[in-house]
């Protein structure tokens, strides 16, 4: 089996930018698998990335935390010959569709073929009905769905779409320093990561929860060594962070709170949480923790 990976915003870019961002996303996937001591082989097609790995469950857990991935599906691969698709789909469906359940076949194609997407759905649907007892077709609210994606000379069969975090691949935008002090600041840093920012964590030496917050972010990003702020006075903290940022080519400071709004800074200050109320921030925090 393999894992079919889909991306979103990358597809809206020009060809050259899209190619560069896709290459970065593949590199991020390889790094994530390496960190998790899991082997993989990766190929790509226009709009899709294919991750081949022996450990599908672990692969899914790795991929669902990689920015730039909109969704992913564990899938089986076969040729685009309609008879081959039919055999593979029926074998696969026997593991997915239970006795007494309803099902639907959803198909789509890319490339030139002697059959239509509807032909695929009808043929596979009939084959499943003839192979599995006591099942029925329900296109509106099925108990199980069988998806078939035909892309040129290959076809992929799967039954679920697992959501990823979306956004842009980590590292495709500028480097920023994120001041980590509480849950809000973690959410702010996470949002910058989702936009492709290369985030360097900064925290106060006296913050006892810093290690906990950093661990949460590390599961979303292979963070570089964090910077420790010695001072506990806001204006001096800003100066320390600015000095560190320039030395490390960070173009801005990311904050999850507004105390620094009253402080003059020679670097841009980013407040990703502006426009979000406390309930929205709490919901996003729970999502980050849950997925992590």
Feature names for model-found ranges:
Residues 224-271, 290-292:
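Conserved adenosine/adenylate-binding substructure
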Residues 78-83, 144-146, 232-239, 276-281:
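A short acidic, often aromatic-flanked loop/helix-cap motif at beta-alpha or helix-coil junctions
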Residues 1-225, 246, 289-292:
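RNA-binding accessory domains that recognize and position tRNA/RNA substrates
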Residues 1, 183, 221, 231, ...:
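Low-complexity, intrinsically disordered short peptide segments enriched in small/polar/basic residues
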Residues 265-287:
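Short, flexible loop segments at boundaries between secondary-structure elements
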